[in-house]
């Protein structure tokens, strides 16, 4: 597959400002007191001992879920593309892959079948493959569709919640390289150690009592004694 993320436009200096974010779900406090200001070029690994906290955080940033407290303000020059952990809702209708991807186009020029097929082709859906129904897709095929959508959107901020799910090794390597080369901002959660280590220059951890926020690599974060002590304190 050819996963290449391009930006329609570059973002200005104001990327994202999060203040006092808090969320409880099913009686469990996922995180609170989350303050975060993203700078241009930040590629952020999002961590938490509770994976639900990460997913809810992404859903709030994407505007799909409301926080219990706090505010999220995106810079006016930003546009976001979100790869959710659960993409089931995207594949409810019985559409061909061409028509499925066409839903996310912005103008008549983009709606042309040739244009849409170009993005599907990058993810190895060519010829008749691009005409099959999105209802019969495997987990891996759905992920490939979601990457086609993400490439088509040409956003300058990528929100990726476990993007390596269902991907083979070759696709993971391709994704890793394209995220490393991406010129915009990234917020990323992943179980792939190498991806977090090679892509991210900043680590945030969401805890019930607040945020740990460090400008360092993932490996440095894991080895940092002060961070370790702080984690023990903030989760207790």
Language-model segment annotations:
Residues 8-236:
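ABC ATP-binding cassette signature C-motif
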Residues 1-9:
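Short, flexible cytosolic linker that couples an ABC transmembrane/permease module to its adjacent nucleotide-binding
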